[in-house]
């Protein structure tokens, strides 16, 4: 079983995360940001990852530190994963009503994000939409994965939710075990 626990305790956030990559999509998520809980739940459900996440953040300031640090901790959990025999690459195109999101990932040890997301509103509930790209940058830098995404649509809720669902599906695909593969790199290491 590929299960990991990661904690982060700073002056800005206190986070405890438990991730089972070989899960069934069970989740218990409390960040203090209702919409962020919602899209992280969608990530876990559609990625078939069991995810438990308890966060106490400095939300009296704003949601930036909480969103950033969740990306860091979730990224570290995936970075801890054994890379031997994984498929390495994953992708998904997910519609949600008028919105469509595409995500492709490479778990190749090279962090890089290319994202096309322009929010039309500043907030969804108490979640700042400017933090969407920053979440993925924080995740990618700590998971050491290459991540590309694009989002189109009109409704901001639909756009961000479709993006997190596509992220879950792409990560599920990339983390699947294929015994034929060994280390999926001509270098011999990831």
From Swiss-Prot:
<keyword id="KW-0456">Lyase</keyword>
<keyword id="KW-0028">Amino-acid biosynthesis</keyword>
<dbReference type="GO" id="GO:0000105">
    <property type="term" value="P:L-histidine biosynthetic process"/>
</dbReference>
<comment type="pathway">
    <text>Amino-acid biosynthesis; L-histidine biosynthesis; L-histidine from 5-phospho-alpha-D-ribose 1-diphosphate: step 6/9.</text>
</comment>
<keyword id="KW-0368">Histidine biosynthesis</keyword>
<dbReference type="GO" id="GO:0005737">
    <property type="term" value="C:cytoplasm"/>
</dbReference>
<dbReference type="InterPro" id="IPR020568">
    <property type="entry name" value="Ribosomal_Su5_D2-typ_SF"/>
</dbReference>
<dbReference type="GO" id="GO:0004424">
    <property type="term" value="F:imidazoleglycerol-phosphate dehydratase activity"/>
</dbReference>
<dbReference type="Pfam" id="PF00475">
    <property type="entry name" value="IGPD"/>
</dbReference>
<dbReference type="InterPro" id="IPR038494">
    <property type="entry name" value="IGPD_sf"/>
</dbReference>
<comment type="similarity">
    <text>Belongs to the imidazoleglycerol-phosphate dehydratase family.</text>
</comment>
<protein>
    <recommendedName>
        <fullName>Imidazoleglycerol-phosphate dehydratase</fullName>
        <ecNumber>4.2.1.19</ecNumber>
    </recommendedName>
</protein>
<dbReference type="InterPro" id="IPR020565">
    <property type="entry name" value="ImidazoleglycerP_deHydtase_CS"/>
</dbReference>
<dbReference type="InterPro" id="IPR000807">
    <property type="entry name" value="ImidazoleglycerolP_deHydtase"/>
</dbReference>
<keyword id="KW-0963">Cytoplasm</keyword>
């Amino acid at each position: 079983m590929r299960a990991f626990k990661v904690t982060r305790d700073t002056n800005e956030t206190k986070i405890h995360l438990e991730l089972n990559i070989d899960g069934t999509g069970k989740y218990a998520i409390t960040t203090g940001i209702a919409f962020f809980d919602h899209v992280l739940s969608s990530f876990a459900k559609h990625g078939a990852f069991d995810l438990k996440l308890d966060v106490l953040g400095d939300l009296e300031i704003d949601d930036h530190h909480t969103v950033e640090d969740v990306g860091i901790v979730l990224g570290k959990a995936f970075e801890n994963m054994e890379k031997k025999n994984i498929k390495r690459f994953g992708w998904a195109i997910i519609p949600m009503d008028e919105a469509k999101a595409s995500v492709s990932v490479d778990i190749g040890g090279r962090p890089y994000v290319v994202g096309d997301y322009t929010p039309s509103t500043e907030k969804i509930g108490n979640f700042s939409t400017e933090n969407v790209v920053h979440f993925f940058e924080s995740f990618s830098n700590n998971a050491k994965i290459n991540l590309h995404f694009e989002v189109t649509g009109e409704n901001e809720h639909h756009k961000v939710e479709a993006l997190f669902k596509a992220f879950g599906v792409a990560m599920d695909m990339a983390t699947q075990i294929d015994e034929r593969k060994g280390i999926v790199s001509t270098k011999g290491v990831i």
